[in-house]
Amino acid sequence: MSLLSIAALDLALGGHLVLENVHLTLERGEIVTIVGPNGSGKTTLLKSIIGALTPQRGCIDKSPGMVIGYVPQRLHLDATLPMTVSRLMRLPRRRPTHEIETALDRAGVTQQASSQVSDLSGGQFQRVLLARALLSSPDLLILDEATQGLDQQGMADFYRQIERVRHELGCAVLMVSHELHVVMRASDRVICLNRSICCAGTPERVAASPAYRAMFGLDDEDALALYRHHHSRSSLEMSP
């Protein structure tokens, strides 16, 4: 049985059909990235998977007992509110100290445990959100534009950490990204979504798809060059 299986999913918001006839499977241990233009339904699909939105049609089948960790697109905290990373990790319910330490270590922010959240850099804050998602040792880790606002080095470091988490936990990773070079470097499969799934497959197969090229305004040479350039660098950039 697949870790996650979605079939014939339709979801409307405010009378507007946002997702139509979406089919998707996800296996344990793989990294899958969803790409698409703004308003294409990417975040809506993630919210339907975590149960925050209810589809009008179709089904979402999850492996029995599956645990999901979710890193949101953004989390706004009052900068004037004193809060350490350790305290944030204990909200909304307290966790044993050893669980918090393990999650912070997996996310690469052990040294920030006593830091004020307001003093963290953008990359450090995203890693803290990742640590919160890892507290439950998830079978499926979902990331919604988790590198938004980070520079190139920050993105590379963050996704290197995701690769390590995948290997340590054996979890599946489902992420949304607008960064095509991240998609080609970090993913086992890519899904192009624009209300419906336009194309899906390995990065190389998607890069050769007319639907993918049309979606991002790429010609054949640009799309394949994007794949080959970043795929050839992946073993260096994603290594410890």
Swiss-Prot record:
Species annotation: Chromohalobacter salexigens (strain ATCC BAA-138 / DSM 3043 / CIP 106854 / NCIMB 13768 / 1H11)
Pfam families: ABC_tran (PF00005)
Gene behind the chain: znuC
Domain of life per record: Bacteria
Major place of residence: membrane
UniProt protein name: Zinc import ATP-binding protein ZnuC
Membrane topology field: Peripheral membrane protein
Binding annotation for ATP: 36-43
GO process terms (BP): response to zinc ion
Phylogenetic placement of the source organism: Bacteria, Pseudomonadati, Pseudomonadota, Gammaproteobacteria, Oceanospirillales
Record's function text: Part of the ABC transporter complex ZnuABC involved in zinc import. Responsible for energy coupling to the transport system.
